[in-house]
A protein has these predicted regions:
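Conserved acetyl-CoA-binding loop-helix of GNAT-fold acetyltransferases
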Residues: 96-110, 130-131, 135
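Alpha-helical elements of Rossmann-like donor-binding domains used by nucleotide-donor carbohydrate transfer enzymes
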Residues: 13-17, 44, 48, 102, ...
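A short, well-structured alpha-helix characteristic of acyl/acetyltransferase catalytic modules
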Residues: 1-39, 43
């Protein structure tokens, strides 16, 4: 069973490790793959996402009963979608154990608790996570050759 963990700045080593891992970030290959997250960027990122979310952002780590961080969940207001966009990333070594489904359920519950009524996700058309989102109640809103927009009413 996973729990949500509000990371401290010192915990951002885990986010850096996930974003630098090619297997974890394979879903992002359409947008460049791995993402640099150097320590000098942590303070600004933390201020924006954690310290001052302004009702527009939510971010948590997924934490296993063992105490290991296994992924992240987040949502943020995306003007191009006209609503809140979901984010679920499970660190590759922890995939295949139901963490993505559990993380998505935790994200939807947190968003609903925070007054969000609809969540969207734009997913690369070749991303196998589409099946996960559809199995959890998301529906296809629109599609292009490159991506699919999914939506769930909370």
């Amino acid at each position: 069973m996973l729990s949500l963990y509000l990371p401290e700045k010192k915990d951002l080593w885990f986010r850096r490790a996930m974003l630098a891992d090619a297997q974890t970030m394979a879903y992002n290959r359409a947008w460049g793959g791995v993402i640099a997250f150097p320590e000098e960027d942590w303070a600004d990122w933390y201020a924006y996402w954690i310290a001052c979310p302004e009702g527009k952002r939510f971010y948590r780590y997924l934490k296993a009963e063992s105490g290991d961080f296994v992924g992240e969940i987040a949502y943020h207001f995306d003007a191009s979608l006209g609503g809140f966009a979901a984010d679920v990333i499970v660190f590759a070594p922890y995939r295949g154990r139901g963490s993505g489904a559990e993380g998505l359920e935790l994200l939807c519950a947190a968003a609903k608790e925070n007054g969000v009524s609809v969540l969207y996700d734009d997913i690369a058309a070749d991303n196998p996570a589409i099946a996960l989102f559809l199995s959890r109640g998301f529906v296809e809103e629109s599609r292009t050759a490159d991506k699919i927009i999914l939506r769930i009413n909370l």
